[in-house]
């Protein structure tokens, strides 16, 4: 089993020293869903939510969150992100919204946390914008889909 890189020999949490690591191209993709009543999904799709453009706002919130991950997650490095893409797709089969994020960087450490944070905050934003219509919404399945670059190479999640 690999060791936990954020713990020192005494078990204390520390920020990993990446000063000797060469910058490399790194990407990460994550996904999550927010499940809701069919009527709530209809409100979102038809643009009838009282707070405005739910999906556009959630997309921007996810992008902003990725850029601020180092302020939210202890021991996360601040990174100069090259790309953040957040997609919010209505899915009548849930019913709800399927949210995906892709993050890219040329840097010394990966962007998994940035992709996961983008998805998490986008889901929370959807909840906030339509909670008056449906307090029973569920945020589910937030997970890393893929990461590439760095010493550990490629990771791809098993299909859900």
From Swiss-Prot:
Catalytic activity, reaction form? (8S)-3',8-cyclo-7,8-dihydroguanosine 5'-triphosphate = cyclic pyranopterin phosphate + diphosphate
List the HAMAP family hit by this protein, alphabetically.
MoaC_B
Gene Ontology biological process terms from the UniProt entry:
Mo-molybdopterin cofactor biosynthetic process
Enzyme class comes to lyase
* Top-level taxon of the source organism: Bacteria
Q: Name one GO molecular function term.
A: cyclic pyranopterin monophosphate synthase activity
What does the sequence similarity comment in the record state about its family? Belongs to the MoaC family.
Coiled coil regions in record: none
Taxonomic source organism: Methylobacterium nodulans (strain LMG 21967 / CNCM I-2342 / ORS 2060)
How does the record describe its quaternary structure? Homohexamer; trimer of dimers.
> Which pathway or pathways does this protein act in?
Cofactor biosynthesis; molybdopterin biosynthesis
The UniProt annotation places substrate binding at 75-77, 113-114
Q: Which residues form the active site?
A: 128
Concerning InterPro entries, the annotation shows:
MoaC, MoaC_bact/euk, MoaC_sf, MoCo_biosynth_MoaA/MoaC, Mopterin_CF_biosynth-C_dom
**What name does UniProt use for this protein?**
Cyclic pyranopterin monophosphate synthase
Function, as annotated: Catalyzes the conversion of (8S)-3',8-cyclo-7,8-dihydroguanosine 5'-triphosphate to cyclic pyranopterin monophosphate (cPMP).
Q: Does the keyword Lyase apply?
A: yes
Q: Which regions span the lipid bilayer?
A: none
Query: Keywords on this record?
Result: Lyase, Molybdenum cofactor biosynthesis
Gene it is expressed from: moaC
The UniProt record lists the EC number as: 4.6.1.17
């Amino acid at each position: 089993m690999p060791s936990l890189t954020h713990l020192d020999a005494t078990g204390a949490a520390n920020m990993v020293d990446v000063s000797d690591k060469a910058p490399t191209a790194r990407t990460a993709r994550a996904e999550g869903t927010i499940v809701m009543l069919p009527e709530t999904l209809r409100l979102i799709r038809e643009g009838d939510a009282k707070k405005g453009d739910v999906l556009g706002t959630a997309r921007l919130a996810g992008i902003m969150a990725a850029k601020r991950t180092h302020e939210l997650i202890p021991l996360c490095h601040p990174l100069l992100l090259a790309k953040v893409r957040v997609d919010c797709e209505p899915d009548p089969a849930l019913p709800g919204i399927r949210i995906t994020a892709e993050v890219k960087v040329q840097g010394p450490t990966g962007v998994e946390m940035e992709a996961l944070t983008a998805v998490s905050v986008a889901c929370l934003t959807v909840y906030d914008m339509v909670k008056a219509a449906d307090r029973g919404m569920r945020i589910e399945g937030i997970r890393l889909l893929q990461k590439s670059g760095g010493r550990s190479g490629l990771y791809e999640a098993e299909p859900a």
